Amino acid sequence: MKVCLIGNNLTSLILAYILSKKNFNIEIYSLKSSKHVFNTRTLGITASNLKYLEKYLDNLSRNTNCIDEIKVLIQNGKINEEILFNQNSINLFNMIKYDQFIKIIKKKVSQKKNILF
């Protein structure tokens, strides 16, 4: 089966890679790659989504940072309040740099013969 994807973004690249592993032929249509570098952007991936992605992208968790606690400080005049998320130290999500994630998925996509640009 042949699938056409529009756009050369993270979602399209992940979808193309996963479908190619299931023996679909993929064509990705996009304009020239944007020269924007998002070296300060990060993504938060939940534990369940990371587990799913690791079925297709080996060792992805090695490139992530585990976040198990978030503290928010609210300063409003005389009131200083701190909100703590996840006092149980359960993994909330994993952070990965956007450009690093794109590099990983583009490398995987470029190795697949059934994905065309």
Where is each model-derived feature located?
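N-terminal FAD cofactor-binding segment of flavoenzymes
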Residues: 37-75
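Glycine-rich FAD pyrophosphate-binding loop
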Residues: 4-8, 17-41
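Conserved N-terminal helical subregion
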Residues: 65-117
